[in-house]
Amino acid sequence: MAQITMNIQTLDWTMGETVGLHLMVKKDCKVRIAWGDGKVQVVTGKQEPASEKLAWVEAGHAYPEKGVNYTITIYSEEEDAIIGFNGCGMFEVKTLDVILTECPNLRILGYSGYGEEKLDVSKNPLLEFIDFHEVRNEKLDFSANPLLEELHIDGSEDLVSLNLSKNDKLRRLGIFMCHNLQHLALSNQSQLNEVDFALTHLRPKDLEYLEKTLKRNSSYKVRGGSFGDEKIKEISHGMNPTRKK
């Protein structure tokens, strides 16, 4: 069985009772979303037209009351059914937490929310892509995610320490506006060649190693400050100017 759980609170403002999300589901597998108010929605995995590539399927809900806590449960009887989860329409409600520990085959994770959510992906070893903004963790360690290629945790103001020492495959990193982040550990074999750390004040030692890593990987792109300076700079070295950002 695969399961993702979210605890939310609807809010007393315009659209404060609405939520939406996208799922990438294995072809023909069914996934149920129990919205927590007695309503259940079922989605089925499908491919994009004229392609073998899996398509995102949409799900959404409007709650009957504002200012009420609800538990959303996304689940399938098949352990490998849920491949991607993007909570892209959760910004109108307050997120209390997002629980991913029972979805071991998750490869793609996105979340745009507001609230108190902390990120725990220690039980998701197949993750390749994470875009999870404004997490409330003080420390994050992605040692359990060796396949991770792209990570964005922009706006995570509570974050102090980020451990990527086991993430050899990581190529893109977004830590924009992580104001308190100072400690960044990278793998000695890191393939990192694109980073955005504007308005993030890494300590000089870690910033120096970051720059060495980027230069070692030849073609690289960086946007950020220099040694804690808020001045934003953009550097492209050896990159094709037509490359899609």
Task: Mark where each language-model region is.
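Leucine-rich repeat
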Residues: C103, N124-L126, V135, N145-L147, ...
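Functionally constrained cores in energy, signaling, and assembly domains
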Residues: Y111, G115-E116, L126, I130, ...
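N-terminal capping/linker segments that flank leucine-rich repeat
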Residues: M1-G115, K123-P125, P146, N188-S190, ...
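A short local loop/turn or secondary-structure capping micro-motif enriched for an aromatic residue
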Residues: P49-E52, F129, L170, L192-E194
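Conserved hydrophobic beta-strand positions in leucine-rich repeat
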Residues: I83-F85, R107-Y111, E128-F132, E149-I153, ...
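Canonical leucine-rich repeat
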Residues: L96-V98, L109, L119-V121, I130, ...
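Canonical position 11/12 of the leucine-rich repeat
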Residues: F91-L96, G115-E117, R136-E138, L147, ...
